């Protein structure tokens, strides 16, 4: 479908606005995936706080210009589906990774996080980032274990002191 200049400008403005508030971006090729499967992916994306859109490569290059996602420019070849994680940096990567497992034709091209390009082979780095709640739980369990260990060492020192006396 041919887009006039105003439509192109509107697309660039909309996606640029989303990119400004995004934590990470993931680029994929969805050729060969059925419409039903893509609809499921979009629904799961909305629930996970992920903005997804198929955008022409020339327009996408304009969108990422001057942003932390500029490193993705070289991956804009062929049909490009871009997903921006709005709430958690690993949300889009996790979503695409799970979807790619179930759909062989879906191919993750690359991701970007804090200005760093993450190739498709290393997408797990981003997908396995813990959520805020998970990170907090890990920290609390580590602190709890450290306190218990200190108590045990203190009691052992008191016991040793009593035995020596």
UniProtKB/Swiss-Prot annotation:
GO terms for molecular function: large ribosomal subunit rRNA binding; structural constituent of ribosome. SUPFAM superfamilies: Ribosomal protein L10-like. GO terms for biological process: translation. Transmembrane segments: none annotated. It holds the Pfam family Ribosomal_L10. The keyword Ribosomal protein applies. One of its GO terms (cellular component) is large ribosomal subunit. Signal peptide: none annotated. The keyword Cytoplasm does not apply. Keywords: Ribonucleoprotein, Ribosomal protein, RNA-binding, rRNA-binding. Forms part of the ribosomal stalk, playing a central role in the interaction of the ribosome with GTP-bound translation factors. Part of the ribosomal stalk of the 50S ribosomal subunit. The N-terminus interacts with L11 and the large rRNA to form the base of the stalk. The C-terminus forms an elongated spine to which L12 dimers bind in a sequential fashion forming a multimeric L10(L12)X complex. Belongs to the universal ribosomal protein uL10 family. This is Large ribosomal subunit protein uL10. It comes from Pectobacterium carotovorum subsp. carotovorum (strain PC1). The lineage of its organism: Bacteria, Pseudomonadati, Pseudomonadota, Gammaproteobacteria, Enterobacterales. The gene is rplJ.
């Amino acid at each position: 479908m041919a887009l006039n200049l105003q439509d192109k400008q509107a697309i660039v403005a909309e996606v640029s606005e989303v990119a400004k508030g995004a934590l990470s971006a993931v680029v994929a090729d969805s050729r060969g995936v059925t419409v039903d499967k893509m609809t499921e992916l979009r629904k799961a994306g909305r629930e996970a706080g992920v903005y997804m859109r198929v955008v022409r490569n020339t327009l996408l290059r304009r969108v990422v210009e001057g942003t932390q996602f500029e490193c993705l420019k070289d991956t804009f070849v062929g049909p490009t589906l871009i997903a921006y994680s709005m709430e958690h940096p690993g949300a889009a990567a996790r979503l695409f990774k799970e979807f790619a497992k179930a759909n062989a034709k879906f191919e993750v091209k690359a991701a970007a996080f804090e200005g760093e390009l993450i190739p498709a082979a290393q997408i797990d780095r981003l997908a396995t980032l813990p959520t805020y709640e998970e990170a907090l739980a890990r920290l609390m369990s580590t602190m709890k274990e450290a306190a218990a260990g200190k108590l045990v060492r203190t009691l052992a020192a008191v016991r040793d002191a009593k035995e020596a006396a």
